[in-house]
Amino acid sequence: MHTLTLPAPAKLNLWLHIIGRRADGYHELETVFQFLDHGDELSFALREDGVIRLHTEIEAVPHDSNLIVRAARKLQEQSGTALGADIWLTKVLPMGGGIGGGSSDAATTLLALAHLWQLDWDEDRLAALGLSLGADVPVFVRGHAAFAQGVGEQLTPVDPIEPWYVVLVPQVSVSTVEIFSHPQLTRDSLPLKMRPVPEGNSRNDCQPVVEQNYPEVRNALNSLGKFTEARLTGTGSCVFGAFPSKAEADKVLALLSATQTGFVAKGSNISMLHRKLQSLVKKSSA
């Protein structure tokens, strides 16, 4: 049985400003997404009977509610294909960590199955379908670091520096709904007028609320903050700090390992998923 194995990379919100709240309850954001060379891995095998089967169950997530299954079925339905797939997940990224695990898995599923099912779908169409699954899915479908506006779906490619990061993973899952509904959340940051998007003098507007409500996150920020500027990604719980070399990042993580769990990863403006897909295209055309 031939299988297609692809990564589902993590992302960081290098900063995140909330500039308003819409009538439908969603928040207007401005943020910069950058990928990490670290993530989940998914394997896909073609089925002729139309069945979508995820062989790796995730605790507390019913099979039919999993974003991987939902993405596969939505693509199947909208494309009209009679084909199905067996799917296996190697889960590395934490749930509720703010590094995009579920959204990235969904995007990898869309791109993988469009390839396996030989669908004539371009990136725009896959990204639009991805948006119906979650606001962060389109950036993973497109695979380029981006300045995002709206609810996070209006994407402009950017190329920030690509440092090494220490990412700490507090052993707590932060509820995005809880954070975005919190009365003390800043919702009136001024929209950016500058282009290109500045990299300095920024923040994550969710961070004060998360720090206040999740002491594990506050402790991680304080620990990493002794070595570099530490910041929350997304609504958390993961926090990150940048370093100029892998050696320095590894050293800091080792110093924190007695009290913190985390990993070191390279920032990347082109996702490792897209680099892998590009290599597959080159092989098939060679």
Curated annotation (Swiss-Prot):
EC identifiers of the protein: 2.7.1.148
Swiss-Prot/TrEMBL GO biological process terms: isopentenyl diphosphate biosynthetic process, methylerythritol 4-phosphate pathway; terpenoid biosynthetic process
Membership in a protein family: Belongs to the GHMP kinase family. IspE subfamily.
Organism per entry: Pseudomonas putida (strain GB-1)
Keyword set, alphabetical order: ATP-binding, Isoprene biosynthesis, Kinase, Nucleotide-binding, Transferase
The UniProt record lists the keyword Phosphoprotein: no
Pathway recorded for this protein: Isoprenoid biosynthesis; isopentenyl diphosphate biosynthesis via DXP pathway; isopentenyl diphosphate from 1-deoxy-D-xylulose 5-phosphate: step 3/6
Enzyme class: transferase
Catalysis performed (reactions): 4-CDP-2-C-methyl-D-erythritol + ATP = 4-CDP-2-C-methyl-D-erythritol 2-phosphate + ADP + H(+)
Residues reported to bind ATP: P94, M95, G96, G97, G98, I99, G100, G101, G102, S103, S104
Function: Catalyzes the phosphorylation of the position 2 hydroxy group of 4-diphosphocytidyl-2C-methyl-D-erythritol.
Protein name: 4-diphosphocytidyl-2-C-methyl-D-erythritol kinase
